[in-house]
Amino acid sequence: MNQNPILIQRHHYRKTFAQKTPPEPLFLIHDGGGTVFSYFLLGSLGRNVYGISNPHFGTDLTWTNGIASMAECYAKLIKETCPFGDILLGGWSLGGLVAVQIAQILSGDSELNVTGIIMIDSTFPAEGQPIKTRRIAFNAEASTRPEMTEKTRKCMNEAQLQIRQWTPPVWRFPMAEVQDGQSHMAGLKMNDTTTPLSPPAILFRATDNSLDSNTDVSEASDTKVSNDGGSQALGFDRYENFDLREVVDTSGDHFSIFSNDNVNELSKKLKDACDKLTKKS
């Protein structure tokens, strides 16, 4: 994991009348196990694709402020790789939540613009809602060796705590100012709650929501979702001002969407989602 981000797919761009500039690169954040192994299984997405692994993987280091600290670090890594222009962010499971946090951090960047977010079967941990168990994904194939298993387990345990403690970022208009604890938005009605403030997002939902009873609980960590966690938006419909444009069903359950049987379908749908989010109006 010395190279971070790592280039997973290199797109050989040729200028055409319809495509005058290279496609926006996609940065995919690691799963709950801390690795980007699964993203190497994807078919061509028609753009440069980078994977960001957990740099604390295999160490005794932890993230002081959880997902917020992680996102700050990853935002810097992204800026070093792509200092200006348009980009896409995304990730599987935990990675989708971290991508949302990174997008909020980069929202104030004048040179780098997040044109969209792609969340792969990520669930929104709505505070104050009834909860049930759901699990944080990682790819077991990447951790078959004993030493890898232990490193992965540590990342999963930390991810479990991170999600439980995560406070999702608040999306505001750039002109919003906070004075005396109140938000004043120039040119906007104070009761205007209809305009989404985040980059547009597309959520991929595994169509088989059942958890395999034979799955060893040591291979997954729990996170909190509402009792309607199987609903189409996986809780993101309750995320205020979050611009969720579309929910795309994809074959498999939370753990098998990258399997040989399902990854081709996922790849095609991911490519379509990237194209939609970057389409110039």
What are these model-predicted stretches?
Residues 1-281:
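A hydrolase-biased, glycine/serine/histidine/acidic-enriched motif that marks catalytic-domain neighborhoods
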